[in-house]
Every structure is written in structure tokens, then in C-alpha cells.
Amino acid sequence: MYAEERGYGSFDNVIQAYEQIISQSLHLKRFEFDNGCFIEFLADSGTCETFSKGWISMIYWTSETDSMGSLTVDIGMDEGKCRTYRARGLLLCSKSITSISQNTEGRERILTVSHENGKLQITFVTIAKVSSEPELRNLGDLKFMEKFEKECRALDRKKHDDEHRKRSGKQKEKRKVEDIDKKKEDEKLKQEEKKRNDEDKRPDKKDEFDEPPKEKRQKSHHETKRNLEEQSHEDGIAPTSTTFVNGAVEGALSPCVSIDNHEDQQHDELDKRVYAQGTNREGLSNEDNYGNFQLNKSLEQLRARLVASSGEVVERSLSKLKERLDYVKDNLIKNVLECADVTVPSKCLSKTKHIEQKKQIVFSDCVRSVPVCEIKPFIDMRVFETETTQNARRVRQRTRTTVGSTDGAIGQQRVISGQNRGRARGRGRGRVPRRRNSNLNNLRTQNSAIVIDDSSETENFENAGSFNEDLLATTILETL
């Protein structure tokens, strides 16, 4: 007998999560650990593996006599790894140790689990039986040793084959899936290639902008030329060499016409290359192609003249447009300056007496403070010769009549006073006699009131005969 397979596991900081007694003979326990280590030996080689955090599940069954049973230990790690150990046979159980010994054909398996003081130990050993007990006495015999080694090698080979069979089965399944995916990709590529080949085999579609054949092109050219000549005869215009197909005359250019010289140069280079090779794109001979080339060249010359003449016309129109824009711009600037909002009062430039304004003159949305002395020169006195001036004239006429009547009365009074030479009646002693000028002044002041507006205050002029322009301007400002 010899130990064929060995496994030793040690786990730290083990805590029992729960224990479940399903029946009197079936028990379930679960443990959790922080870190652990497991060492395996197979023949003359071994491996060591460490874990960080995981769980251990232990299921064991006992018979009625507690002499037989089974034990299964499952180890799971957070990293996704797992291990399983199981055994069935004779049972040895205590408070902290559970051990089972399984005896099969030529092999004996022992599984032991011990849990004590926060540590859990797992031991798994497989012992192989090679020969019977009498044969063990002849271990010194060379033949027996050779036989023993052959049996050991056979067992190792068998185990290796089993493992290889398992790995190969997994690899075959994986390879099968890869082959299926590869076949799908190949079929897809073949379909795309077939579709591409079918499109290449189709006849090329002619572009809409390809030139028509030579016969049709010449026919259309002659027809258009004939129509233009007939139209020019009807209109009284002599046909010249500068008349184009579209009816335009040399020097005239529509503003929406754009000429791409670069594209024409590319076409010319292509025609020259094709002519040098012997045939053009439409399969024409060198002579026909040369005629087309000459025709295109003459058209290019005419186009160049057209561009040169149109440039002058455009420059003239642009200069006129620029002048008009400058004129409109100057007018706009003047209007804006006139309507600008000026908060600082303007200074008086007049040498006459300056009268400060009491209100601002408002013209639409523009506000500007204007002194009275600047308004006065622009006042047309004839405009204000309305009711106020008419009233003033009436007052003058009345005063003249009253003055005449008063002169007569005064003359009569002088005669009476000369005759009587006494104190005038109706006058107290010690009073100053009334004078003619005082009566006239009172009469003038009573009749010289000029009303500018119903809402404004009435103002009296000192002298109705003379027109005070400064006072009139101030009154107009207050009214406005």
C-alpha cells in the first residue's frame, strides 16, 4: 500500500454561519473564512493554491448504528473557483472531528474535517493497494519491485488519461462552437463578394451629363444657329460671328451665369490625351476628335472675351452702387445726429441778451434743449398775427378814439376851468390833479392784454405799440 493522492487544506478566521439538522441522520453545516491555503500532491509533484474569502459547506449522513455514513465537502471562493471532496464508508465522528474511510477495489479513501478555535482543517488521502500482505515481505526482491513500479506507472497513466479526456472533451466543445462561428463568417463574406461581382458585371449606366454623340451634337448646333439667324433677321439684327447659341451677344453676361475655367481646362487636357492615344471617349477617329477640339477651343476664346467685357460692366455698376450707398449712409448719419438724445444744454452763441428756457421743445421722439435766443431769429412774426395781433390792433384803434375824445373833453375842461378859475368839482382838497397821460396809460394797460393760450397765464405788455419779441418767444416755449 502507498499514498497515491494527498490533499491538505487550512483555513483561518472560520465562522460557522449556520447548522441545519434535516433529520436525525442528515446534517448540514456552513462555514465562512477570510483566507485559506490548499496543497495537493500527486505522485512526485505538488501544487499550492491560496484563497481570499469564501465559504465551506459540509453535508454528512449517518446510519442508525452510527457506524456507517457519507461526507461531502464543497469549497467556494469569491474569485469563482470551487472544489469538491466526498467519501462514503466507515464513520468516525466526535465534537470537532468528522472522518470517513472508504474502501473500494484496490483503493482506500480517507476524508477528515476538523473545526476548532477559528481554524478548519481538511485532509483527503487516497491509498492504493498493490499486493497482498504475503507479497509485502518480499520487498527486497528485484522482480517484485519491477512489478510494483509497473503497477504504479499504470495507475498514474490511467489517471493522466482520465484528466486528458476531460480536458479534450471541453476543448472539443469549444472548438466546435468556434468552427460554427467561422462557417457563418465565411458564408457572409462569400455572399458579399458574390453581390459585389454581380454589381461589377452589370453594364455601366451613362451619366446624365455625358456628351451626346457627334451627329446629334452637330445637328442641334446647326438647328440652334439657324433659329438664331432667322430671329435676328426678324428683329433687324445682322448675324455676326459673336452671336452665341443661347442668343447672347458678346459683352453681355447674365448675372446668374457662372463659368468654371478649371473644369474646362480639365476637359481639354482629357481630350488632348485621348486624341494622342488615337480615339476619344466615344470611339471617334482622330480627325473627328480634332474637329471637336477646335470647336471647344473657339468656344473657350469666346467665353474669355465674354468674361473680360462683363468685368467692366460689373465694375461700373459696383462703383455706382457704392456712390449711392455712401449718399444714403451720409443722410442716415445726419438724421441720427439730429434725432440724437443730447442731455447737455447747448450753449448760446448769440450776442443778444440770453434768456434761459423753462421747458424743452419736443419734436416727435427727439428731445433737445434750445435757448430762446436761438429760436427768436427763426420766428416768423406773420405766423402769430392771429387773434392776438388783431386784438392788439383793435386796442390801438380804441385808444386812438378814446385819446381823441379825451382831448376834446380836456379842451372843454380847460375852457371851463379858465372861465371859473376855481377848484374843480369832485376833487378833494390836497389831492394831485389827474393828468391826461395817467388816464391814457391806465386805458392802455387795461386793453393791452394778449392771450397766447387758454391754458397759459395772461401777460401784459408795457407798451401796446411796440412788439416785445423776447417775451413772445418765452411765452411760446412755456405754451409748448
UniProtKB/Swiss-Prot annotation:
Residues 156-241, 417-438 are annotated as: Disordered. Keywords: Host nucleus. Residues 422-437 have a biased composition (Basic residues). Not phosphorylated. GO terms for cellular component: host cell nucleus. The keyword DNA-binding does not apply. May be involved in DNA replication. This is Protein U79/U80. The gene is U79/U80.
